[in-house]
Structures are given as structure tokens and as C-alpha cells.
């Protein structure tokens, strides 16, 4: 029977058996042959789950054993099988970056778009791990690139989040959505800016990522780039914003064209002279970006001829046009500076500084050229505003260069036009570059303004949260802070106004480009009113002197006009020297004023630094004051709660008194409602007796009337009988009968009415009797309410006692609350004391830390000395080793000598002396060997001791005795070295 049962027993294939364990072990070891043999056995399955939820198929994919996977696939394993976590073999291969396994699975028709429990595909895991080959294979097999997981992430977002820029490039090239967002509203650009991956940011911007998108918190990509503190990413974003703004609002070039037209009309130069701007070379770009690279180039022979003769006015006018354009562009930059926020103005002003410095250097070069040829025209370039006035005067003369040129001019008109073309083209190129830079700055300023607005919104929301607090002191603090903010804003505005005035002076030529670097950061400073007034006075003085310089320049220009008209008069040498000395004095005065202003500025900076330090100290004091204010607020809250408790207890007492009064009133009202007064009862009894007597009289009357009616009936019957006896006619008889019938009917009706009346009266009498009985019962019960009254009184007294006990309990609770408040106050005082103790402990701990640091430094120094000593000891050991080697060599020599002596002794039978000498030498050799062994032992012991001490010193566990010994050793070593 057992054999039959065994034959017909069905083997359960889902149960875990030994073959499955062996299969897992073979996959773990990567033994493909063993895997193939085990899969051929019954009961073994590659997709069977163990107790931990693992399968052999998934383990092979996770470990990257391609041969094992191939064997399993040939045995017909389910490729789409998932483990307990919802991962397929493809997911695990991608998660562990095994691209060969991914290729094998995809070739065996494993779906690339399969999703696990978190909504991720294999491409999600490959992108997150940064395996480019796996991503390429999955994309070749058309894995969905823009499929989102449960968190809203596409593979591009995961690649950017983990900083894999190569995969980001690849996915973007294969159609990944650049502006895709996750559930928190973040795009790939925001994530790249947050982690600071400049390569990913660059790739995303090239593929058209939208910089204006905002996440669920209201932050854009520029905000996250500031969090990462990567200047390269910030510059990339700002340049992209500026380019987008250029495409949207192409108004700036038109304004520039209008300015150029106006300047050309003022100068009066013919349109043919303006050559088209050449393409921007790298050298020019470097000239614009780095002001230090600009150097003054020497003039050629043709240019010297050109500047030596009167027609050089055309080039002066072109230079003035360029400078006018530059002044307009700088005014645009100044207006932008007012709009930008404090945080971004520093970066933008630093960029502007570089550009302004490069321009000023270029202008200096031109001025040097002019000064080399004509000092009068060089002085004419000192003020920027004077160019506009001179252009109108020089217009007609520039329009007729042939008439004004003297016959002794060496340069031809073609040379003049060529030199003018070169200068104008260079200047136009630089102006265009500056305009582009200014447009970039405008974009950056707009983006910074948007961020400033966001910050203001956050500030307002935080203020609203602060306002929600109950403490009035917090609101007072916030109002104080807002007042301080307003004051700082007003100071900031005043400082900005002064910056603008300084920049205007830059245009007038009063401020040097070197001082511009100092003034660029002036907007950060909060200057007091007295300093501002002093600076304003200095500026006014400088402006007055600039006006004087303008007048001098105008006089020079008038002289130039006279020279153009034909009166070519060469000034004498004395006048030229006087003019030169006057201009030198003016320049020296201006330099002195600049130095004075710079000193003032430095003093203001120092004072502002002091103010900042005081502000910081005030902020720390305010923080401590806020803690004290919070404590005071808590004390006030406790006092208010005590007051509320006392008020509630008073209200409770009043309510109890009212309750007692109400109960007394209610008891009286209930008694009066339930019982009738005796006088009222007697009146009611009298009324009922009277009504009863009346009813009895009415009854007697009704009975008498009834008897009368009966008598009349009897009489009538007798009459009828008599009439019957006496014969009467039928008609009369009928009449009599009808009359009698009617009379009988009437009488019957009267009788029925009387009966009804009697019944009603009897009912009334019964009611009155009932009332009498009830009144009698009430009268009998009138003696009972005293007991009930006593019961009520006792119950009320018990309630009063209960209420009194409750009152006592409430009073006790109040006392407990009061005691708790006292305890809380004492605890607060204890906390204060503990806080003070903790602060003292902190100070002491800090001192201990400082002492420990000093000790640690000393220990380090001692360690260094120990190391030196160890090095010296090693050197000594080396010397000892050398000596030992020498001794061993001597010993060998002695042994050889002994051997030779022994041979001689054998041969010549040496004397006893030689044998004694040999023995002595052997003893010396033994002694030396013993000394060597002892030295080695001592050396090893010293090394072990030093090692132990060094370890203890590193761990900070060196004993004081050891330190003293080490110090003594070091002093001994020093003394020995000094003696040597």
C-alpha cells in the first residue's frame, strides 16, 4: 500500500527544496554548468521565491552573471517575472549597471517599458546609476524616455539629480522633455543648479530649458544656482536671460541708432566716412573684458602727419561721438543700478567696473595721442559734457575739410579718410560690445528684481506668521525692526544718490577710474548724515572747479574755430609754456581733490565698519533681550491666569448664591401651586353649597310641575272617556283628536326637555359631590405636606453642604494653582540660575578646551622633538651598526689571524703565549658579541617605549610623568648637541 501511495503522490513543485538552495548557491558563485544541471532536475525552478523573496533568475541579473541568465532563458524561464518588491530582472540589471545582462534580457523579448511598484522603468535606474551603455541599449530598444514614476521623475531628472551630465546629454539628444517637472514642480535645470553641475546646466540651456519656470515653493533656477554658490552657473543663467530679453524686446539697438544719428548730425561728418563694423576678433573681446590688456600703441607716420595738421578735427569729432555713446550707455547702467537689489548689485557693479575701466583706459590712450600732437586738443578732452557743445561749433568746419587745410599739408584726403575709418570702426565695435554687455546687465538686474520681489513676498508671509502670535511684545519688536529697516533703506537710497553723483562726476572727468573701484561698492555702505553733507560739499566744490575747466575748454575751442577760419597763428613759446603750467596746476589740483575725496571715502568706510560692528553687537543684545522679553511675557501670562482664576472663583460663588435663591423661590412656588389657601377653600365650599341648594330647589319645582302635568293628563283622559260616552260627530272628534295629539306631542317634548335638564342637573350635582369629596380629601391631606416640607428642607441642606464642600475644593485647587505658579516661578528662577551656571561652565569648558589645545600643541611640538630625537637615535644606531660591522670585520680578521696562527702552531708547534693570546682574543670576541646583543635589546626596548608614548600622545593620553621624562630627555639631547 505504501508503494502505491508513493507512486500516486503528487509532488508539490511550489515548495522550496534542496535543489533550489543549490541553484541559488550556483548562481551566487556564477557556475553556469551547475545551474544547467540543476535546472534539468525535477522541482528546481529559476523563478521560485525563497523565504527572503529572492529568486535565482533575479539574483543572476543583480550579480551580472550573463552565462547563468543565458542558461535560464534557454530552459524557458519567465522573463517578465517579478520578485516580492516588484522588480523584474531587467530592473535589477539596470539598477546594478550590468549592460550585458540588459542586452541579453532585451534580446529574449523582455519588455523595456515594464514598470515596478514605484513606477520606474529600467531606464530610470540606468539613468540614476549613470551607466551610459545601459541607457544606450535601452533607448535602442525604444524604452519610454519621458515616462514618469510615482514621484513624477523622468529618467532625465534622475540623471541630473545624481550629476550624470553625459547621460543628460544623451537623453536630451534622444528627445527627453527639457521642461518636465516632478511632483514638487522642479525641472531638470533647477536640480542641475541645486547640485552645481555646470555641464548639465549648459546642455539643458542649449536644448531650450525655460529659465522662468517656478516650482511649488515659488523658486526658479536662478534661486537654486545661488544656493549652490556656483558663479559659473549664475553667469550662464544671467547671460541666457539677457539673450531671451534681447529677442523679446529689441528696442535697445534702435535707441543706440537714434543716439548715433544725433551724434552724427551734431558732428556734421559725411555718411561715407562710416565704414561697416568688422566681425569681432578674439583680441577685441579680450580688450573689452580685461582692461589690463589694453596698452597704448605707438602712432604710425601717416597718423602723425594727420594729427599735425588742421584736418585732424574729424577724428576728434568721431572720438567725441563714441564718448557720447559711452556716456549714454553708462547712464543707462546707472539707471539700472537704482532698480537692482542689494545682493545682485555687487556682481553687476563689478562687471561694470571692468567695462568702465577698459573704456577709461581706451580714452586715456586717445588723450595721450592728442597730447602728443596738440596740447590744446588734449585739454579739450578733459570734460565729457563739453564734447556736445564743441560738435555744433566744429560741424561746418568738418563739413569742409578741403577749404580749411593749408597748402603745406603733407597728407592726402584718402589717407585722412582711411585713418578715420579705422578709428570709427574700432570705436563702433567697442560700443556695440558695451551695449550688448549693458543689455545683459539689464536682464540680470530684471532677474534680480524678480528674486527681490520673491524675497519680499517671503518676508511678508513671515511677518504675517509673526503677527499671528499673541504676545504684544513680539509685535512691538517687529515694528521696531520695520522702523530700523526703513531707516536703513533711507540711508541706502541716500548712498545710491551719492553713487550716482559720483558716476556723473566720472563722466565730467573729475573721478579717476582707479577710484571707481572704491565707489562701486559704495552702495553697500550706510553713511551717517554728517558724512553725507561733508561729501556733498566736496562734490559741489569739485563741480564748481569742473565748470571753470569747462569755461577754459570753451575758450580753447573758440581759438580752434578762429584757427579754422584761416587765421593760422602759431602761439609763441612763452604762451604755450604758461598754458602748459596752468593745465598742470589744474591737473594737480584735481588729483589733490581726488586724493582728499578718497581719504574721506576711506574714513567713511572705517566708520561704517564700526557701525556694522555696533549693529552686530546690538543684534546679539536684542537676541538676549528677546529671551528676557519672552520670560516676562510668560510671567505676565501667569499673572493673567491667576487673575482669571480669582474672577472665575468669584463668579462661581455668585452663581451658587443665585442657585440657592432660585431653589428657595421654586420650593415656595411649588407649594403654592400644589395647595390652596383655607380662605379660598371656604369660599369655594360656600359657593358649592349655594349652587347645590339652588339645584335642589329647581328639582323640587320640576317635580311639582311634573305632578301637575300628570294631573292634567288624568283629567283629559276622563274628559275623553266622557266624550266617548257622549256621541260626537266625526269631524269634531277628529279635530279634538288632532288637537289632543298636538298637545300630547308638545307635552312629550316638554317632558323630554325637562328630563334632559334633570339629567344635566344630576350630572352637575354628581360633579359637585365629587368636588366635595376631593376637597374633603385635600383637607384631610393638608396636614401631610409638613413632612414632605421637612424632607425638602433636609435635601436642600444636603445640597448646600455639597456645594460648600465643592467651594472648599475649588478654593483648595486655587491654592494649589497658586502654589504651582509659585513653584513655576521658582523653577524659572532656578532655570535662570542653571543657565548662568551653564554659561559659567561653558566658559570654563572653553578655557579648558583652550588649555587642552595649548597642551595638544605642546604635545605636538614635543612629538616633533621626539621624532627628531628618534631620528638622531636612528643615526646613532646606524653609527653603532657601522661600528659593530667594523668590529665584526676585525673579529673576522682576528679569526683569520687565529686560523693562520693555529696553522703555524700546528706546523711550527707555537708556544704557550700564542695559545693564551688566542684565548684572550676569543674571550674579547664573545664579550663584544654579548655587548652587541644587549645593545640590540636595549634599542628594541627604547623603540617600543617610544612607539607606546607616541601612540598615547596621538590619542591625548600621555601621563605627566612621561611628559616630564620626555622633556628631560629632550633637554639632555639639546645639551649634548650644544656641547658638540
UniProtKB/Swiss-Prot annotation:
Compositionally biased residues, Basic and acidic residues: 247-259
Stimuli inducing this protein: Up-regulated by all-trans-retinoic acid (ATRA) in retinal pigment epithelial cells (ARPE-19).
Residue list for modification Phosphothreonine: 249, 295, 297
Region of interest: Disordered: 247-301, 387-423
ANK repeats, residue ranges: 18-51, 52-81, 85-114, 118-147, 151-180, 184-213, 217-247
Coiled-coil annotated residue ranges, if any: 349-374, 425-947
GO molecular function, one term: actin binding
Tissues in which the protein is found: Highly expressed in placenta, muscle, kidney and testis. Moderately expressed in heart, brain, lung, liver and intestine. Isoform 2 is widely expressed and expressed in fetal and adult testes, and spermatozoa.
UniProt modified residues of type N-acetylmethionine: 1
Modified residues (Phosphoserine): 11, 281, 286, 293, 300, 304, 318, 327, 329, 340-341, 350, 358, 419, 512, 515, 667, 915
Superkingdom to which the source organism belongs: Eukaryota
GO biological process, one term: cell differentiation
Keyword flag Repeat: yes
A cellular component term, taken from the record's GO annotations: cell cortex
Residue numbers covered by motif Nuclear localization signal: 270-276
Biased composition (Polar residues): 282-299
Stated role: Plays a role in actin regulation at the ectoplasmic specialization, a type of cell junction specific to testis. Important for establishment of sperm polarity and normal spermatid adhesion. May also promote integrity of Sertoli cell tight junctions at the blood-testis barrier.
Subunit note: Interacts with PALLD. Associates with actin. However, does not bind F-actin directly.
The protein's name: Ankycorbin
Annotated source species: Homo sapiens (Human)
Gene giving rise to this polypeptide: RAI14
Amino acid at each position: 500500500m505504501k508503494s502505491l501511495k508513493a507512486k500516486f503522490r503528487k509532488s508539490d513543485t511550489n515548495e522550496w527544496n534542496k535543489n533550489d538552495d543549490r541553484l541559488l548557491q550556483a548562481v551566487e558563485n556564477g557556475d553556469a554548468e551547475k545551474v544547467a544541471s540543476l535546472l534539468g532536475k525535477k522541482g528546481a525552478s529559476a523563478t521560485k521565491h525563497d523565504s527572503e523573496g529572492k529568486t535565482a533568475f533575479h539574483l543572476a541579473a543583480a550579480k551580472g552573471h550573463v552565462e547563468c541568465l543565458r542558461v535560464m532563458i534557454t530552459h524557458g524561464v519567465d522573463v517578465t517575472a517579478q520578485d516580492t518588491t516588484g522588480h523584474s530582472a531587467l530592473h535589477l540589471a539596470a539598477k546594478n549597471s550590468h549592460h550585458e545582462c540588459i542586452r541579453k534580457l532585451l534580446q529574449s523579448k523582455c519588455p523595456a517599458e515594464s514598470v515596478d511598484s514605484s513606477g520606474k522603468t529600467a531606464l530610470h535606474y540606468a539613468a540614476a546609476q549613470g551607466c551610459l551603455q545601459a541607457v544606450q541599449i535601452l533607448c535602442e530598444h525604444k524604452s519610454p524616455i519621458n515616462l514618469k514614476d510615482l514621484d513624477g521623475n523622468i529618467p532625465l531628472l534622475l540623471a541630473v539629480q545624481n550629476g550624470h551630465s553625459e547621460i543628460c546629454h544623451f537623453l536630451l539628444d534622444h528627445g527627453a522633455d527639457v521642461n518636465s517637472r516632478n511632483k514638487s514642480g522642479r525641472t531638470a535645470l533647477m536640480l542641475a543648479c541645486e547640485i552645481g553641475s555646470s555641464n548639465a546646466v549648459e546642455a539643458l540651456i542649449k536644448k531650450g530649458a525655460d529659465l522662468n519656470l517656478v516650482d511649488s515653493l515659488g523658486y526658479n533656477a536662478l534661486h537654486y544656482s545661488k544656493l549652490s554658490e556656483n558663479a559659473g552657473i549664475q553667469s550662464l543663467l544671467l547671460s541666457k536671460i539677457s539673450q531671451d530679453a534681447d529677442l523679446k524686446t529689441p528696442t535697445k539697438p534702435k535707441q543706440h541708432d537714434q543716439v548715433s544719428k544725433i551724434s552724427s548730425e551734431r558732428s556734421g561728418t559725411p555718411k561715407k566716412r562710416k565704414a561697416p563694423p568688422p566681425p569681432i576678433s578674439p583680441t577685441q573681446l579680450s580688450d573689452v573684458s580685461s582692461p589690463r590688456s589694453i596698452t597704448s600703441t605707438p602712432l604710425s607716420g601717416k597718423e602723425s602727419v594727420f594729427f599735425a595738421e588742421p584736418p585732424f578735427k574729424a577724428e576728434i569729432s568721431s572720438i567725441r561721438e563714441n564718448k557720447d555713446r559711452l556716456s549714454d550707455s553708462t547712464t543707462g547702467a546707472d539707471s539700472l543700478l537704482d532698480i537692482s537689489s542689494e545682493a545682485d548689485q555687487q556682481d553687476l557693479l563689478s562687471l561694470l567696473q571692468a567695462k568702465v575701466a577698459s573704456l577709461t583706459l581706451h580714452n586715456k590712450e586717445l588723450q595721450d595721442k592728442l597730447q602728443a600732437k596738440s596740447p590744446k586738443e588734449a585739454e579739450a578732452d578733459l570734460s565729457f559734457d563739453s564734447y556736445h557743445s564743441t560738435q555744433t561749433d566744429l560741424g561746418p568746419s568738418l563739413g569742409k575739410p578741403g577749404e580749411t587745410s593749408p597748402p603745406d599739408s603733407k597728407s592726402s584726403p584718402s589717407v585722412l579718410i582711411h585713418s578715420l575709418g579705422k578709428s570709427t570702426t574700432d570705436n563702433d565695435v567697442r560700443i556695440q560690445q558695451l551695449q550688448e554687455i549693458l543689455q545683459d546687465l539689464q536682464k540680470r538686474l530684471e532677474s534680480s528684481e524678480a528674486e527681490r520681489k520673491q524675497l519680499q513676498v517671503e518676508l511678508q508671509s513671515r511677518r504675517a506668521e509673526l503677527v499671528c502670535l499673541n504676545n504684544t511684545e513680539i509685535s512691538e519688536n517687529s515694528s521696531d525692526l520695520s522702523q530700523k529697516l526703513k531707516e536703513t533703506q533711507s540711508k541706502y537710497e541716500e548712498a545710491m544718490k551719492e553713487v550716482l553723483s559720483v558716476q556723473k562726476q566720472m563722466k565730467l572727468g573729475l573721478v579717476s577710474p582707479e577710484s571707481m573701484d572704491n565707489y562701486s561698492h559704495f552702495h553697500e555702505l550706510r553713511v551717517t548724515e554728517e558724512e553725507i553733507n561733508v561729501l556733498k560739499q566736496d562734490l559741489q566744490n569739485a563741480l564748481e572747479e569742473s565748470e571753470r575747466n569747462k569755461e577754459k575748454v570753451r575758450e580753447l575751442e573758440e581759438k580752434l574755430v578762429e584757427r579754422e577760419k584761416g587765421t593760422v597763428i602759431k602761439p609763441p613759446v612763452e604762451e604755450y609754456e604758461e598754458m602748459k603750467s596752468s593745465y598742470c596746476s589744474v591737473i594737480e589740483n584735481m588729483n589733490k581733490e581726488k586724493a582728499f575725496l578718497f581719504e574721506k571715502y576711506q574714513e567713511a568706510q572705517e566708520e561704517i565698519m564700526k557701525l556694522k560692528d555696533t549693529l552686530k553687537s546690538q543684534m546679539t543684545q536684542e537676541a538676549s533681550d528677546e529671551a528676557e522679553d519672552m520670560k516676562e511675557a510668560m510671567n505676565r501670562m501667569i499673572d493673567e491666569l491667576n487673575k482669571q482664576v480669582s474672577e472665575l472663583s468669584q463668579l462661581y460663588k455668585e452663581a451658587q448664591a443665585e442657585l440657592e435663591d432660585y431653589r428657595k423661590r421654586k420650593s415656595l412656588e411649588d407649594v403654592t401651586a400644589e395647595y390652596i389657601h383655607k380662605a379660598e377653600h371656604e369660599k369655594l365650599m360656600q359657593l358649592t353649597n349655594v349652587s347645590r341648594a339652588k339645584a335642589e330647589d329647581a328639582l323640587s319645582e320640576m317635580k311639582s310641575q311634573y305632578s301637575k302635568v300628570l294631573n292634567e293628563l288624568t283629567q283629559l283622559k276622563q274628559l275623553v272617556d266622557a266624550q266617548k260616552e257622549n256621541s260626537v260627530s266625526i269631524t269634531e272628534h277628529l279635530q279634538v283628536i288632532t288637537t289632543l295629539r298636538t298637545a300630547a306631542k308638545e307635552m312629550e317634548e316638554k317632558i323630554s326637555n325637562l328630563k334632559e335638564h334633570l339629567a344635566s342637573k344630576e350630572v352637575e350635582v354628581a360633579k359637585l359631590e365629587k368636588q366635595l369629596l376631593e376637597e374633603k380629601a385635600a383637607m384631610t391631606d393638608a396636614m401631610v405636606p409638613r413632612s414632605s416640607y421637612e424632607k425638602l428642607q433636609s435635601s436642600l441642606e444636603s445640597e448646600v453642604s455639597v456645594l460648600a464642600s465643592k467651594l472648599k475644593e475649588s478654593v483648595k485647587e486655587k491654592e494649589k494653582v497658586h502654589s504651582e505658579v509659585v513653584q513655576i516661578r521658582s523653577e524659572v528662577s532656578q532655570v535662570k540660575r542653571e543657565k548662568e551656571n551653564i554659561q559659567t561652565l561653558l566658559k570654563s569648558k572653553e578655557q579648558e578646551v583652550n588649555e587642552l589645545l595649548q597642551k595638544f600643541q605642546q604635545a605636538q611640538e614635543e612629538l616633533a622633538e621626539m621624532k627628531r630625537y628618534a631620528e638622531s637615535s636612528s643615526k646613532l644606531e646606524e653609527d653603532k651598526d657601522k661600528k659593530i660591522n667594523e668590529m665584526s670585520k676585525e673579529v673576522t680578521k682576528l679569526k683569520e689571524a687565529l686560523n693562520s696562527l693555529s696553522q703555524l702552531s700546528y706546523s711550527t708547534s707555537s708556544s704557550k703565549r700564542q695559545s693564551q693570546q688566542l684565548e684572550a682574543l676569543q674571550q674579547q670576541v664573545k664579550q663584544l658579541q654579548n655587548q652587541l646583543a644587549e645593545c640590540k635589546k636595549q634599542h628594541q626596548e627604547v623603540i617600543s617605549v617610544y612607539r607606546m608614548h607616541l601612540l598615547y600622545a596621538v590619542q591625548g593620553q600621555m601621563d605627566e610623568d612621561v611628559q616630564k621624562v620626555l622633556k628631560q630627555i629632550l633637554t639632555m639631547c639639546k645639551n649634548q648637541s650644544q656641547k658638540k
